[in-house]
Amino acid sequence: MIFHIFQIDFIYSFLISFIMLKNLDEITSSIIADPQNKDFTERGIFPLFSAPKTARINIVGQAPGLKAEQSRLYWNDKSGDRLREWLGVDYDYFYNSGIFAVLPMDFYYPGYGKSGDLPPRQGFAERWHPMILGNLPNIQLTILIGQYAQKYYLPENKDNVTNTVKNYRQFLPHFMPLVHPSPRNQLWVTKNPWFEEQVIPELQILVKQIINKD
């Protein structure tokens, strides 16, 4: 089992303890007011994440895409359709059951670069995830989608995404690493048939067990 001690800047930790941020509304307001997010806030763009107190499964991806930013709905694209297929749940259950938390590595769309969406901003997850997770006592499984989530939550793991996903059992029962469900990764899925033959069925069993647990 790989454990991760979240590293938070000392000064910021002091400020947070001083102003006593406790609930999600306060945390969300603090994210919006953070100078790091000033450009987004001034444009009327607000952090995109979901953290119902009843959540049992936490999904950590890269960052919202442009479509998610525009629609104000995370995983609202073909990647989301495939993710729900992998999880074995439908659209309504994914968004409305209260079972799933969605905490990407950045809560804002970082923009587009030469090879696709830019990476999440450094330090964002370190700053906000621990506080939010402190409000989610029922998380039983964290699904880590892509290299940024895996590097942060599995700091002792030095493998690339393919090998990390292939060796997923060593991270269970707390973490399940996945490749990104983007259609652009279909070639990867085709070249690695073990993923849909072995990983996805086991993921669906885990999700079903967690959903049905009293």
UniProtKB/Swiss-Prot annotation:
Pfam assignment, any one: UDG
CDD domains to which the protein is assigned, alphabetical: UDG_like
Signal peptide (from-to): none
Gene3D superfamilies cross-referenced by the UniProt entry: Uracil-DNA glycosylase-like domain
InterPro entries, per database record: HI_0220.2, Uracil-DNA_glycosylase-like, Uracil-DNA_glycosylase-like_sf
Superkingdom per UniProt: Bacteria
Family under the similarity heading: Belongs to the uracil-DNA glycosylase (UDG) superfamily.
Protein name according to UniProt: Uncharacterized protein HI_0220.2
Species of provenance: Haemophilus influenzae (strain ATCC 51907 / DSM 11121 / KW20 / Rd)
Lineage: Bacteria, Pseudomonadati, Pseudomonadota, Gammaproteobacteria, Pasteurellales
